[in-house]
Amino acid sequence: MKVLLVFDFDNTIIDDNSDTWIVQCAPDKKLPIELQDSYQKGLWTEFMGRVFKYLRDEGVKADELKRAVTSLPFTSGMIELLSFLRMNKDRFDCIIISDSNSIFIDWVLEAAAFHDVFDHVFTNPASFDSSGRLTVKNYHAHSCTRCPKNLCKNTVLGEFIDKQLQKGVRYTRIVYIGDGGNDVCPVTFLKKNDVAMPREGYTLHRTLAKMSQNLEPMESSIVVWSSGVEIISHLQFLIKM
């Protein structure tokens, strides 16, 4: 049986937020104040829809967005980690669950030739309309009160595990690699053999530390990382167990 690796994308695989990164395509590399102030909590995808409309209205073309997105740096050690996983696909299945969008993730994975590492990518579907505007839809509707309106990562992970079980695929454990507040929900549902891997110093790490102080126990083990090379070391340890 394999290990399932679940990756976030922004600030995990890549070392920034792809949505905020493309603001560099705007005039003077910033958004108008009224557009910045239009964000409402939990409605990030709707906000980004307005950002993409503004960029289109300012004459920003798809190839400019692509140049910006594919210039995003990978997080330290992540290229080494993804290369390690490619060489060990017999031991690991890898999926991405991300609040970014399908076009940005495709661009990054294609430019770096890492598409083959991942078995599935779950994210907000995106496309360019006839006017050249990038449009992004919510991934799904859900009833989770802890997550943004467009995506509950725990629901997505649970549905994926169920579908794999229906195909007769079981995993020895789940390793969840992430950084953000929207990674808290799926991580808290991990089981005893599973591993939560929060990026050091980021929201997920701080939240799990606070939960520990408040004696809110988690079933899974927690392994903090700051480089993909550290993740490789832990995965090598797991497959030797």
From Swiss-Prot:
Catalytic residues per the record? 8, 10
Q: Which reaction does it catalyse?
A: pyridoxal 5'-phosphate + H2O = pyridoxal + phosphate
Keyword entries, A-Z: Hydrolase, Magnesium, Metal-binding, Pyridoxal phosphate
User: What is the annotated signal peptide range for this record?
Assistant: none
* Cofactor(s) needed by this chain: Mg(2+)
Q: What class of enzyme is it?
A: hydrolase
Molecular function GO terms recorded: metal ion binding; pyridoxal phosphatase activity
Which amino acids does the record list as binding Mg(2+)? Answer: 8, 10, 179
User: What are the binding positions for substrate in this chain?
Assistant: 19, 99
Any idea of its EC number?
A: 3.1.3.74
- What is any Pfam family matched here? Put_Phosphatase
Q: What the protein does? A: Phosphatase that has high activity toward pyridoxal 5'-phosphate (PLP). Also active at much lower level toward pyrophosphate, phosphoethanolamine (PEA), phosphocholine (PCho), phospho-l-tyrosine, fructose-6-phosphate, p-nitrophenyl phosphate, and h-glycerophosphate.
UniProt record similarity statement: Belongs to the HAD-like hydrolase superfamily. PHOSPHO family.
- NCBIfam families under this entry? DKMTPPase-SF, HAD-SF-IB
Q: What is this protein called?
A: Pyridoxal phosphate phosphatase PHOSPHO2
Supply the source organism for this entry. Mus musculus
